Amino acid sequence: MRCLVVADLHYSLPQFDWLLSAAPQFDLVIFAGDALDIGSSVDFRAQIVVVKKYLAMLSGLTRVILCSGNHDLDERSAEGEKIARWVGDIRELGIACDGDDLTIGGTHFTVCPWWDGPLVKGRIEAQLRDAAAERAQRWIWVHHAPPANSPTSWGGKRYFGDVELVQWIARYQPSMVISGHVHQSPFIPDGSWFDRLGDTWVFNTGLQPGRPPVYIVLDIDEGSAFWLSAGAAQSIDLKAPLTRPATPITVAPSWLTSLDQIADPSLAKPASAAG
């Protein structure tokens, strides 16, 4: 199984367009939160409508998992906690989202919501506890915030990760945790797109502007992870101990060659010269 991982697209429509073009080459697309952008000039309700349309098209191309991030919260629950109510609507599209668990082959996925208070946090704890009771060969969590005190949550001056997540990882030891949230971690000194806590691999895609987005490819069967940004292409062996730095990709896999050939439609329509 080959998985395409993105996060923090923040309503960048060129990046969503690229995602639609790339998706058919993968068995699963994992969107680790922050599809929307609370800082955008586009009305938040309009963003939700547009992103839902993209997700509907995406779900027609391959299987999709999406968890909420802090930019995706559109309402408060009756208890006063911020929630992404719209994310629950995409379940109708066949997309696994906040609070869902699904198994594909020998891999079990747990999709965690962004939590803003004790009630949602308690639901995540119950979700993990229930999934642990029927643990599959591989267990992968999708959780927008990376763990605290990890290179994947390093912001340059301090860590921005989730302390509770560190405790959950120590307790249940999943195979992988897929996150985003801390945009700069993979690009700065002492930060990284990958880490390992005990036996658990942790990933953070990071964020870059423009098209394509920065992304990770997980080849579950081969036990490899690839990270592709505008300025780097790296891979790690998930069957080996944690080693830094990651290995530069010198021989491109066929899927990477195909992704590089995705055309940017904006380049086909150059702006008219002023005059």
Region spans (language model):
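Active-site neighborhood of phospho(di)ester-bond hydrolases with catalytic His/Asp-centered motifs
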Residues: V5-A7, V29-D34, V64-N70, A96-D98, ...
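Conserved catalytic scaffold of divalent metal-dependent phosphoesterases
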Residues: D72-E164, A268-K269
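Short, conserved loop/helix-junction motifs that constitute active-site signature segments
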Residues: A23-P24, L55-L61, A133-R135, I169-Y172, ...
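Binuclear metal-dependent phosphoesterase catalytic core
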Residues: T103-G105, Q167-R171, I188-G275
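Cap/insert and terminal regions of metallo-dependent hydrolase folds
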Residues: L36-M57, T152-D190
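Active-site-proximal beta-strand elements of phosphoester/diester hydrolases
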Residues: R2-H10, G106-D116, I140-H144, T200-L207, ...
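Core catalytic region of metal-dependent phosphoesterases/phosphodiesterases
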Residues: Y11-T103
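Active-site environment of divalent metal-dependent phosphoester hydrolases
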Residues: H10-D17, L36-S40, C67-A78, D101, ...
